[in-house]
Regions:
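Edge beta-strand at a domain terminus
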Residues: 1, 76-93, 212-220
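N-terminal helix-cap/turn-to-beta initiation motif at the start of protein domains
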Residues: 1-11, 24, 97-100
Length: 220
C-alpha cells in the first residue's frame, strides 16, 4: 500500500484545473488511509480500493492508476473521473482537432454532438462516438479520450505528420521514426498486429488493408 501511495504522491487535477486528490504521507485529501484492498494489475498500472478516515466516518475510494513518470500520468477516481498532474496534460498527435486526454465536452465543442454511437468492432471492442462526415470515431475512458480511429476515406489526417489511411506503412515508420515498418495484413483475419510508439506515451495501430489507423494511449 505504501509503495502504491508513494507512486501516486502529489496533487491530481480535473480538466478544469480543480485539485481533486492530494496524496502523500499515507493520507489522501488530509484523511488517513486505513486500508487498501482488491488490488489488481501491477504497481505502475493497476487498481484498488482505499479506505480513508474522514471526520464523518470511513469512505472508500476506488482508484485506477497509470503511472509512467510522464506528463500523461493519470488516476481514474471511482470509475468516472480522470485526473492528471496538470489540468491540461500535453499531447503529441491529434486528428481533426481532437487529441488523447480531451474531455467529452471538449470533443463536442470541436466536432459537435456525435451523430452516432456505434459498436466499433472489429477495430476495437467497445462503443464510441462516430462522425460519419469525417469518418472518425472517438472512444473514452471515464470522461476523457483514450482512442481516436481514423477510417479509410476520411479527409482528416494525423495533424503532426499529415498522414492518414491513404499512406503506406513505411511512410508512418519514417514520419514517426519507428524501429520497423508496421505490419499490415491484407486478408480477412482481423489479427491484431501490434502498437507502435510515436512518443509522448501515444501509440498507433493499423487495421487490415489500412482500413483504419488508431491513435491510442494503450501499448497493447
Amino acid at each position: 500500500v505504501t509503495k502504491v501511495l508513494n507512486l501516486m504522491e502529489g496533487d491530481w487535477y480535473d480538466a478544469d484545473g480543480n485539485r481533486v486528490l492530494e496524496i502523500g504521507g499515507g493520507y489522501i485529501n488530509g484523511c488517513r488511509v486505513l486500508a487498501a484492498y482488491d488490488f489488481a494489475g501491477a504497481s505502475s498500472h493497476g487498481a484498488g480500493r482505499f479506505e480513508i478516515l474522514e471526520s464523518t466516518g470511513t469512505r472508500n475510494l476506488y482508484l485506477q492508476w497509470d503511472i509512467r513518470h510522464a506528463d500523461t500520468d493519470s488516476i481514474k477516481l471511482n470509475d468516472h473521473q480522470m485526473l492528471h498532474r496538470t489540468a491540461k496534460p500535453p499531447f503529441n498527435e491529434s486528428i481533426a482537432g481532437i487529441h488523447l486526454g480531451m474531455t467529452a465536452a471538449e470533443v463536442t465543442a470541436v466536432l459537435g454532438t456525435p451523430p452516432q454511437v456505434l459498436d466499433l468492432s472489429p477495430y476495437v471492442n467497445t462503443h464510441g462516438w462516430y462522425y460519419p462526415d469525417l469518418r472518425i470515431a472517438v472512444t473514452f475512458d471515464a470522461d476523457t479520450v483514450d482512442r481516436i480511429l481514423l477510417l479509410k476515406g476520411s479527409r482528416a489526417i494525423l495533424e503532426r505528420s499529415g498522414l492518414n489511411c491513404e499512406n503506406a506503412p513505411y511512410e508512418f515508420a519514417q514520419a514517426y521514426q519507428m524501429k520497423h515498418v508496421p505490419h499490415v495484413r491484407y486478408d480477412d483475419s482481423n489479427v491484431f498486429t501490434g502498437c507502435h510508439a510515436i512518443g509522448g506515451e501515444e501509440y498507433l495501430s493499423f487495421g487490415n488493408r489500412m482500413e483504419c489507423v488508431m491513435l491510442s494511449k494503450y501499448w497493447n
